[in-house]
């Protein structure tokens, strides 16, 4: 009996890491804001309850593709990161790296830190909502597993038509 429960737990936790693929159109519709920017800094921190690690990334906004953002710098927060010898990796989350040029599909969120009233953004669709812009001008996304909808996903998109 306990072996069956262990197997069911394992299967359910594995299944939760697989998502349905989202097209660029679906990501755009689900997002309040879509931006092109550069990652200025990343800072891991403990959640308020001290049970998990989240990372806050400071992003300099270069272009607003959809929506309105009045500030030139925003904070994007996502689960995972490393503090000292402790690290948390989350399946289907593509960590942001300092100096990275990116396109992000975002929605407003609440910070997991103690800072009250800090306005943060979360990435829509986990890793699907992050494109890394290469030196060739192509924005690429990776780092996620999908159960269905592969045909809908645009893994590579040209940046120029987006930033008119």
Spell out what each predicted region is.
Residues 2-4, 8-164:
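Transition segments tied to proteolytic processing and entry into folded domains
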């Amino acid at each position: 009996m306990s072996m069956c429960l262990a197997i069911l737990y394992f299967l359910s936790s594995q299944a939760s890491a697989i998502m349905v693929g989202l097209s660029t159109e679906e990501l755009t519709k689900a997002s309040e804001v879509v931006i092109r920017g550069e990652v200025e800094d990343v800072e891991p921190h403990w959640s308020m309850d001290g049970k998990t690690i989240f990372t806050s990334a400071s992003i300099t906004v270069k272009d607003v593709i959809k929506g309105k953002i009045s500030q030139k710098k925003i904070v994007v927060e996502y689960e995972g990161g490393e503090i000292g010898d402790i690290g948390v990796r989350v399946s289907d989350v593509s960590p942001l790296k300092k100096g990275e040029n990116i396109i992000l599909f975002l929605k407003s969120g609440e910070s997991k830190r103690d800072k009250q009233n800090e306005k943060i953004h979360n990435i829509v669709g986990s890793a699907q909502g992050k494109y890394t812009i290469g030196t060739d001008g192509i924005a690429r996304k990776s780092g996620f597993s999908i159960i269905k909808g592969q045909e809908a996903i645009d893994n590579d998109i040209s940046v120029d038509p987006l930033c008119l």
